Amino acid sequence: MKLTCMMIVAVLFLTAWTSVTAVNTRGELENLFLRASHEMNSEASKLDKKVCVDGGTFCGFPKIGGPCCSGWCIFVCL
């Protein structure tokens, strides 16, 4: 019973995905990533502007690659 329900959900999902991504009525699929990448406004993206914390500033739990400019955080940025 569970397998049948899972198969029905998978078929419905794949059918909906194909319908949403179809470019035209012939069923050709569009590469959404390539289209979106050249339409992006890189100046408006906040991901391009990485803000880091200077050494000696509290950064939280020890981790590598956190908000510190050096990439090392052991309660304070190193």
From Swiss-Prot:
Keywords: Calcium channel impairing toxin, Cleavage on pair of basic residues, Disulfide bond, Ion channel impairing toxin, Knottin, Neurotoxin, Presynaptic neurotoxin, Secreted, Signal, Toxin, Voltage-gated calcium channel impairing toxin. GO terms for cellular component: extracellular region; host cell presynaptic membrane. Residues 23-48 form a propeptide. Expressed by the venom duct. Disulfide bonds join 52-69, 59-73, 68-77. PROSITE patterns: OMEGA_CONOTOXIN (PS60004). Pfam families: Conotoxin. Residues 1-22 form the signal peptide. InterPro entries: Conotoxin, Conotoxin_omega-typ_CS. GO terms for molecular function: calcium channel regulator activity; ion channel inhibitor activity; toxin activity. It comes from the Eukaryota. It is found in: Secreted. Belongs to the conotoxin O1 superfamily. The presence of a 'disulfide through disulfide knot' structurally defines this protein as a knottin. Omega-conotoxins act at presynaptic membranes, they bind and block voltage-gated calcium channels (Cav). This is Omega-conotoxin-like ArMKLT1-011. It comes from Conus arenatus.
